[in-house]
Structures are given as C-alpha cells and as structure tokens.
Amino acid sequence: MIKINALTKSYGEYPVLQDIHLQFYPGEVHGIIGENGAGKTTLFKCLAGLEDFKGSIEYDGGVLKNQTGFLPTIPYFLSKMTGFEYLKLLCNAREILKPDIEKYNLFQLPLKQYAETYSTGMQKKLAITGLLLQKNEVFILDEPFNGVDISSNMIIHEILIRLKQLKKTIILSSHIFSTLQDSCDFLHYLKEGKIKKTMSKGNFATIENEMKTGQLNTNIIESLYSS
C-alpha cells in the first residue's frame, strides 16, 4: 500500500500541491484527473522520488522508488541509442541481466532504430515496454494514452487489466475524463493543487459533472451563427 500524508509542494512562494491525502492499494487502478496545471505531473514526480516535498509518502513494500516504473508525459531518450539498447539499459538498472526483449516487444517496435527517431507515440510505447520489462510493483503513468493510436490505446488498456490482476499498484493521470473512466477503479479530482473529490467506479459521473462546471457555454457558438 502507498499512503500519502499531508503532501505539500511549492515552487518558491507558489503552492502547487496542498495537503494531499491519498491511499493506493495493490490490484487497483487509480486515476488522477484534472485540468492542465492542476499539479498532476508534480504529484507523480513526488511519488517517483524526483521532487522534494513536505509531508510523507509511506510504502509497505520497501523503498518506493526502487519498485516504481514512472512514465513521464514526454519520455527522454539518449542520443544515438536504439530501442533495443534503451530497453536493455532499463533492465540492467533493475539487475535483469538477460531479458528476452524481442519476445516482449508488445507494440512491434523497430528496436534496431534510434529511439530519438521514433514518433511521439512510438517513444511512449517504448517507454511503457521498458517499465514492464523491469517487473515493477508500482506503475505511475503520466498521460499514458496521449499521442498513441487507437489500437495501441487498446493494448495499453489490456496491459492495465493484466497488471491489476497481478496485484500491481497503478496510478494514471489525464486531463480528459473519457480516457480514464474505463480503465480506473477510483478517480481523484485534482484542482488547483487540492484533491477536491474521490469517487469509486459507478460514481465517476459526479466528477465529470463537476469538471464541466464553468466550461464553455455552447450557446455562445449557436449565437455566433445566428447573428
């Protein structure tokens, strides 16, 4: 289990996250939903051990960052490194010395090509493949469906189901409600650095309706064409 207690993060005098309290259990898929700038990426960086913060994060499985696979919104790749070399590097970091990389090339990527030449979607798929090969217990995926084609989205969704069955802890983010509603067991609505609402599956519409509040009044569009 991962337990976040009173997590607060500021950049200078600007508060990004304020008094976050959350719990994540194995075998559950949690979604962090919120508009751009709500603090989702900062929260994920805190969980992944990449940002300092006030408060605490407890994990009963050992050192959290040693068990965590983190997918950033835009994965980073070293220059002149092939897809195969990238995956091997990630495996070596977890002391997985002889990974069967070709067997687990789920997205049929051209692993002999330089990763930096991949499209945005291909790079994201390569990064996800690397996290799976590492055999992580916790998966923190920042906007995993963005920039990926429909068929690959379906594969990612199936991967999430399998990881859930294997009792892994999965935390996703998105600023688009529809990308999370089918994959997640719980949704946490993050707004202006605060968790405004948490809902279990079956009650997600409550969050969707709250997110719609204050959005564009479509009557404005109609009035443009009627004037």
Explain the meaning of each model-derived region.
Residues F139-E143:
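Catalytic Walker B motif of ABC-type/P-loop ATPase nucleotide-binding domains
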Residues I128:
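Hydrophobic anchor residue at the start of the ABC signature
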Residues D52-N66:
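Conserved ABC transporter NBD signature motif
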Residues I2, L17-D19:
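Conserved structural motif at the start of ABC-family nucleotide-binding domains
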Residues S173-H175:
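H-loop/switch region of ABC-family ATPase nucleotide-binding domains
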Residues K194-T218:
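Conserved beta-strand-loop-alpha-helix hinge in the C-terminal portion
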Residues I150-S151:
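Helix N-cap at the start of a conserved alpha-helix in ABC-type nucleotide-binding domains
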Residues I33-E35:
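The feature captures the beta-strand-to-loop junction immediately N-terminal to the Walker
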